[in-house]
């Protein structure tokens, strides 16, 4: 019986993908089962910001996650991919503040806290689903009914529970300490939100007079202090020298007079001081510098805060002791003409006043890194503020041990050292933020200043037996976004309730994330989870067993993608395509700097002169998987994307060949499997083994390459061709053998490729399943292929491998000698073994058909051959007689011209690369391109010379 069907000439991803995804979602294929006996597999997605849209980094990591999820679902595991979005406190608040400013000319203060928060919820309802829809476009097999948001009621309850319990355990406290303060946004920000920018600055050398007649070793009555921040001079409470610096040892314990403020401050010895920096004497300003803060604590120095929350100079200094409490025994007045000055205006005035007093020694140019708030865009100010803190050292010890003991493994392993270095030097974590949007701190104050922590105001009153008429005010601050994110793996599963989901899916299996948030998020998840989630034996649970750390996706030149550089690529544009005009608008629209827009437009036109073509989701996903080498940053490559779109078409066309073949015979009857049939089954099983091994090591690149290599190089280029002689001249039993093998291997190949390429594999599988006798709804619930050892056939692999080499040798001779592929050739071989002679005899018809041979003849060792072109295949000599095929002299003359032309190109590039001026000025990418061209020309020259030699030897 022959059966076939109609298939379109090419795979149209745009006509298939969204309809298929809708069907999958409606059928509930993404949902975990209720069966507790099945082994579970769970990944919690790093929650993207609700403000955001999908970028290439998201697409990259989510492709890897979905590959694992789909693979494990097909393995029969009860699979959950827990998704959701993060409320992203500061980012979201800024988006909505900008929106109301632009549309209504209002600020959040015009609205008031409650109304403004409602405005954010309205905005979230309107635009918060953008990223979810984009994730659907990527083919992510997520149970959307379980989508969570970090401000959902359940997650908010978990946040309050954690805060209250940590406070009850004495691990959360309120104190006045130094934080990164954004004077524009008026909030503390985390280290992750601080961007250190290279800046050309100055190093001012000021003279601080020694008090009480003291002198330096060389007789001076002053110390020269080097500083990059003159504006904080009024907050100095000491100067410091290195204890082993002989220049100043006699002065340790003495005092200097602080200019402008006219108060004495001590000279302290501290190993923090770099003797080579400036003069080896530094000012210590504990209220305005993180290093000075630590020095101040070691030496019991008071902290003199001279700045307001706007980073202007205060009218009256705030003086705090090392215990964080106000200090009334220390006096530090601020001169009247500094009061109210903006910090950089104060800097200028301090320098001018030192100069007027004859105390400015010198000014040196100095390169430094200035910390900026990444959202406010202004230099941050270390600021003494009242904040809430988590005492994390006890939590960190347990979390560090979990990685040391192998309960959690980092892939690549080198990231464990980064984790350890952070965890072993961990500082208390500032968790409060001066924002309106976020989890409000569950603490209340009465008018006497007493603080009450509980899950609600009602619980405060019950717990502390407070009368109903006692006025309570809730803390205005919200929690750092990373606090709620730190509970992500267990709060999304219903904790603090002991839900069946928590029992079934926790700990999760793997976290896929970037190296930049190992400390800010990964470490905090480990700390919180192990503190709050225990197994049935009371042992702390880890949040995940493996952390797979990805590199960054960079542009083709290796630059980080950013809006300001205008090199951002939208993964949806890779899928659907985008015109040049729309791409230019996306990259340059609404830019503040027109000059920058012009530069970006020029670069975009050069790189994408015709815009970006549609490639489909499968090609994008396959490219991302194929580029995922362990832990390294990835330079995006449009050519690879185009190549993998071609790969999708190759798979589609191979399927068309199989399913529309009118000679395909799947009828009942005698079946004979050929050597080629046994070979392709064996090669497929080896590919399955390679894929499984690669995936178990998180080598997505090797897994993708295994599929690509088998599909293109074995199945399409060889096996499909090897079946053609069978269908043309084989017996009915042989045709059935080839037909069954084609369908069986194609169906298994689709299952193998499905985790990476879900859409095209489902679309083809729906057509294949009838041929394969499968009655099922979807490929995604079919079993993933396993290695069948009985189908591994080393003999078949060896025999077909050798036959392929013979065919390739003949094809190379044709190409080198300009003989048409259709022209029949005589084929002579010499120096064959008895086994090889047998293989030739059994596969004579196959070899003739595949290599277009008129005859196959084995020569004895001493038998003379006619004038031939020869190739060696191992020890075997392949000879093709050339009589009548070519005009030797004419062909040699043609090749001589080609060789000279190629040598000229090589000389041209050698001269270019030998030009020092060119190499110094040209971008690295241009130089790399020239070297690539040089290699191509050298390879071409080698081939031409080989061809010349072969013909000359005729």
From Swiss-Prot:
Entry function: Catalyzes the attachment of valine to tRNA(Val). As ValRS can inadvertently accommodate and process structurally similar amino acids such as threonine, to avoid such errors, it has a 'posttransfer' editing activity that hydrolyzes mischarged Thr-tRNA(Val) in a tRNA-dependent manner.
Lineage: Bacteria, Pseudomonadati, Pseudomonadota, Gammaproteobacteria, Pasteurellales
Annotated binding of ATP, by residue: 563
Listed name of the protein: Valine--tRNA ligase
GO cellular component: cytosol
A Pfam family of this chain: tRNA-synt_1
Keyword Nucleus attributed: no
HAMAP family: Val_tRNA_synth_type1
SUPFAM superfamilies: Anticodon-binding domain of a subclass of class I aminoacyl-tRNA synthetases (SSF47323), Nucleotidylyl transferase (SSF52374), tRNA-binding arm (SSF46589), ValRS/IleRS/LeuRS editing domain (SSF50677)
PROSITE patterns, alphabetized: AA_TRNA_LIGASE_I
Record text about domains: ValRS has two distinct active sites: one for aminoacylation and one for editing. The misactivated threonine is translocated from the active site to the editing site. The C-terminal coiled-coil domain is crucial for aminoacylation activity.
Native species: Actinobacillus pleuropneumoniae serotype 5b (strain L20)
Superkingdom per UniProt: Bacteria
Alphabetical keyword list: Aminoacyl-tRNA synthetase, ATP-binding, Coiled coil, Cytoplasm, Ligase, Nucleotide-binding, Protein biosynthesis
InterPro entries, per the entry: aa-tRNA-synth_I_CS, aa-tRNA-synth_Ia, Anticodon_Ia_Val, M/V/L/I-tRNA-synth_anticd-bd, Rossmann-like_a/b/a_fold, tRNA-bd_arm, tRNAsynth_Ia_anticodon-bd, Val-tRNA_synth_C_sf
Coiled-coil stretches: 883-954
Subunit note: Monomer.
Main localization of the protein described in the UniProt heading: cytoplasm
Assigned EC number: 6.1.1.9
Motif mapping: 'KMSKS' region: 560-564
GO function terms (MF aspect): aminoacyl-tRNA deacylase activity; ATP binding; valine-tRNA ligase activity
Annotated compartments: Cytoplasm
Family from the record: Belongs to the class-I aminoacyl-tRNA synthetase family. ValS type 1 subfamily.
